[in-house]
């Protein structure tokens, strides 16, 4: 079995897969190293002999997690590192080491799945988009605040905007003009993300006409799925790229 980790800014996504055919055996999302250890220790009928991870945390935080995993489970995690080229995709950043590793692995994974031009939109704490042409050249992309950042900025800097997560969830049932603060904020932010997504599609069409694939990933992918007909929703896209970056024997 293989333990795979995607260590983001806010959460750690983990899954355990079989080594033979990459079938997913167990999966979860936690908000701390301690919670990760607790979940993994409670998997009484599942063990793993290998581990690979991608992290956008600081080097010190990543090293600490690697040490914890090594001591707790006697595995040596293999960490993804920046690369100029991977899986037939050429990194388009002027300084390739500055491109976020999770973002890089997501569009490398997307290209690996289709081997054609693709647009990859990742909706997490931040929202990113990336464009890869049919030959594997990364043309660049965009970054904007995701739903959590927009929501928290309004709550932090506007005194009268206060509501809980339950209200936020109810507000997104439909996207008519809000008649309460939670509705107005949640629907407004959602519409901004949908507009962002549609703009990315128009940019992609300017490059390739209709000859490209659209991938959507990240925790808030559902917010834009209905305005992107034909898009492939792939929650574990980063893990597809991670397998290419960190192959295990």
Curated annotation (Swiss-Prot):
Predominant location category: cytoplasm
Any one GO BP annotation for this protein: coenzyme A biosynthetic process
CDD domains: ASKHA_NBD_PanK-III (cd24015)
Pfam families the UniProt entry points to: Pan_kinase
Pathway linked to the protein: Cofactor biosynthesis; coenzyme A biosynthesis; CoA from (R)-pantothenate: step 1/5
Record-level GO cellular component terms: cytoplasm
Location of the active site: 102 (proton acceptor)
Gene3D superfamilies per record: 3.30.420.40
Residues where substrate binds: 93, 100-103, 181
PANTHER family linked to this entry: TYPE III PANTOTHENATE KINASE
Protein name per UniProt: Type III pantothenate kinase
Naturally occurring in which organism (per UniProt): Pseudomonas syringae pv. syringae (strain B728a)
Biological classification of the source: Bacteria, Pseudomonadati, Pseudomonadota, Gammaproteobacteria, Pseudomonadales
Gene: coaX
């Amino acid at each position: 079995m293989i333990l795979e980790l995607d260590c983001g800014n806010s959460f750690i996504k983990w899954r355990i897969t079989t080594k033979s055919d990459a079938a997913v055996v167990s999966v979860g999302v936690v908000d701390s190293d301690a919670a990760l250890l607790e979940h993994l220790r409670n998997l009484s009928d599942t063990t793993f002999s290998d581990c690979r991870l991608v992290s956008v945390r600081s080097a010190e935080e990543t090293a600490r997690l690697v040490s914890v995993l090594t001591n707790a489970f006697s595995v040596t995690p293999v960490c993804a590192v920046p690369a100029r080229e991977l899986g037939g995709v050429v990194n388009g950043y002027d300084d390739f080491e500055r491109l976020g590793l999770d973002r890089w692995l997501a569009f490398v994974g997307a290209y690996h799945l289709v081997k054609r031009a693709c647009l990859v939109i990742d909706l997490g704490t931040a929202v990113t988009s990336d464009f890869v042409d049919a030959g594997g050249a990364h043309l660049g992309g965009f970054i904007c605040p995701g739903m959590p950042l927009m929501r928290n900025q309004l709550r932090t800097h506007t005194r009268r905007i206060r509501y809980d997560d339950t209200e936020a969830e109810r507000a997104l049932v439909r996207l008519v003009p809000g008649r309460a603060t939670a509705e107005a904020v949640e629907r407004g932010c959602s519409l901004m993300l949908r507009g962002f997504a549609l703009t990315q599609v128009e940019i992609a069409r300017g490059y390739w006409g209709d000859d490209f694939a659209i991938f959507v990933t990240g925790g808030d992918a559902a917010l834009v799925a209905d305005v992107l007909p034909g898009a492939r929703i792939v929650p574990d896209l980063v893990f597809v790229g991670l397998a290419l970056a960190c192959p295990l024997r």
